[in-house]
């Protein structure tokens, strides 16, 4: 007979809450800085307002009680969801009230999407351009119209009711946030029951969520889109409740519906292949993925996650224990392996958040690439403005998340890391050989930087000397990306063996025939050459530098040879005190600050590469004589020199935004100008010393005192850290808004 160890015993799922732990007090809530003893006394100097903003959401600084911190984070998540539902509701409301959605639905190839009409106050109505179908408004590039069509929405009334539903959900979220902090707040053990959490998130959110969406796609989206693709007037299409209740309508479109669920229980699942398909490629009518393929995908994903939702041990003594999995994971060269990591991930939400942000950010950038390589919604691929916007948006979101991962990993190291619990495990071993890691990474950055930039400088020099035969290019000295070409070719050929019934490979980027909708290229094979090889190595360089900065910030967050007691100074500090020169700008916060600039560098080049490559080699019109691309394939010839990037991309393509005045795109011209100003304004904070401003302020205060109009709250210059924060915020805001206006004015004009 075997007696199971205490660890083997299941962690019972139980509702563990404290009733009425914190009273609801509007008086307390209305008092600025109520969460801090110092701040709640009110302002003595202008630094107070900055500290208020810095610490309002830094729950660690309000209390050291992990349970209380967990409750605040949990409650704040509901507030965040409420705000998201309000935002989403606003999007749907604009679609219902101020858009040409129904007109677009009837002719998506000629009518452009618009859901914003500018009020005429002092002439702003110039922004309401003619988007077709007798509608004047601002052309939008969010992709909502394509998403709505894919969802099976056929009228503005449906958008209106969904918008109201969004507000109801927002109210429910705000109530839940209040209820789970003030009325029934979960105990710490509930937050730390990871097996139960994994089962619920995997099985419930991802499994049942995907199943519900697959059900919607099968019963509503597929029939509606099949009828729309066949040219049926949206007003003639049966409403969702007809499709759900009247099996005859569905059986007309998908014969297997007549058989009901018998094939499911008799395991004749292939009967359902009329609506759960495996075609591959794009629908030639809409230029989007086959919606029957995506429905099939969501059914498969649902099955996977419903299985995953039963993998972890809770009420019954079967399944995995996260702690056991981690601690059993021990390689021959890695000491204690993952021992101690379970404790870190259940007591440090910063560590948890760092991992999630890194994964989520990487996923966002992967999504950016899938949106053009495998456009998921009807008529998305031929809406070039939306394609460019979605790529840029998901790339930048990913970058911010990844820098956030570096930030929270460093905060974990400073605030939550306990060296006594981490002896010779993976984390300890990484920290002990951090010098080797960072110096190797530094060498890689130098190698990539000099070699990739060196290729460009060589080409610029040869070009200036009139020696094109000595340049690296597809027509002279070729540097073909042979591995990338091999991957493309393999992905193009493989489905013929692995999926013989598929019509095409997963994406047209691999190869095959071009798909055009309404005479515009939706997607076609993307050929890679010397120019792509060169800019790819610039991507490698900038990404490695970003990682170097963030990783150095994390690994040296607690101590360094320069400042052995860094952990005592905290996450952000300007210098190691007076009288110790050369120790400024070494805090973990400063590494995040620098990492943001390199993230911006990296991603600017990524989105520039995408924008130019697509205009040159993919996007364009199809005529009898072939494909006419927007910039006529000039990427391969011009993108191999720095001068080519400046002249044929930045300068040549900025003419639309610079000359937009007096047209419906004039707002982009003003934003372009204003955002340059915001960017330049940031330099005032980044290139200045705090003492200069303090001195200036004191002389101004002296003048006010002379006139007896001195303020009661003493003005103070921003601290070094505050100044850098304001600087980087404006640098990024200015840079992003400049790029946004440049891209949109260009692509709306020529796309």
Curated annotation (Swiss-Prot):
Binding site for chlorophyll a: 684, 692
Topological category with respect to the lipid bilayer: Multi-pass membrane protein
UniProt xrefs under PROSITE patterns: PHOTOSYSTEM_I_PSAAB
Positions that bind chlorophyll a': 676
Top-level taxon of origin: Eukaryota
Catalytic activity: reduced [plastocyanin] + hnu + oxidized [2Fe-2S]-[ferredoxin] = oxidized [plastocyanin] + reduced [2Fe-2S]-[ferredoxin]
Outcome recorded upon mutating residue 676 to C: No PSI detected
Residues annotated for [4Fe-4S] cluster binding in this entry: 575, 584
EC number, as in UniProt: 1.97.1.12
Residue sites binding phylloquinone per the record: 693
Self-association state and partner proteins as the record states: The PsaA/B heterodimer binds the P700 chlorophyll special pair and subsequent electron acceptors. PSI consists of a core antenna complex that captures photons, and an electron transfer chain that converts photonic excitation into a charge separation. The eukaryotic PSI reaction center is composed of at least 11 subunits.
NCBIfam families: psaA
Similarity remark: Belongs to the PsaA/PsaB family.
Protein name: Photosystem I P700 chlorophyll a apoprotein A1
